[in-house]
Amino acid sequence: ELNDQFLKAQSASGVEVVTGATHSSESFQNYAQQLIQAAQAGNTDTIEIDNGADLKDGTYKLEEKNYSNGYRVQFEMTVAGGKVTESNFDYIDKDGKSKQDDTEYNENMKAKSGTEPKTYIPTLNDEFVKAMGEEDGSPADVEVVTGATHSSHSFIMYAQQLVNAAEKGDTQTIEVDNIVTEK
C-alpha cells in the first residue's frame, strides 16, 4: 500500500500513514524522501542507514534549498551524551528572520487554523527532545500539531533524517532540494 501511494503521489509527504503501522509508515516516508533527495542530486550511491545505533555526539543540520511562501526550513539538532539535547527547527526568510516573529503571518494562520508558528514551532522542538529522551524514542513519537499538519509532517520527516545522520556521526549539512510549486 505504501509503495502504491508513493508512486501515485510522487512525493514522500503524499504518502498517508497507515493505521496500525504508524512507525513503519513514517520510516517509509523518511527513506522515500532520502531517495528523492539523492535522485535530485543525481546520486546513485547506496544510502546506508544505521537504524537503532547509538547517537553520536555533535551538531547535525538540515536545510531546505528553496523558499516557499517566503520561508525555508533550517533545522539543527544537538546530541550530547548520546541524547538529543537541543532541537532548533524553524522557517527562516531571506533576511534570516523567523516565521515565529512575523506578526501578520501568525495572526492570519491563527485565525484560519487555530495555531501559529510562534506556538507550534517551539512545541515541535520540545516534543522532539522529550520523545528522544524516552526508551526507544523516535521522531515518529512527536504528535502532529492540529492546524499545522504539513509543518508537523515535514518536521518529523526531517528529524528522522537528522537522527539517521547522528546514528552514523555524519555532521555534514543535509540539503533538501524541496519542490516549490506556484499557486
Predicted regions and their residues:
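Active-site- and interface-proximal helix/loop "cap" or "latch" segments in soluble metabolic
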Residues: E1-D54, E63-K183
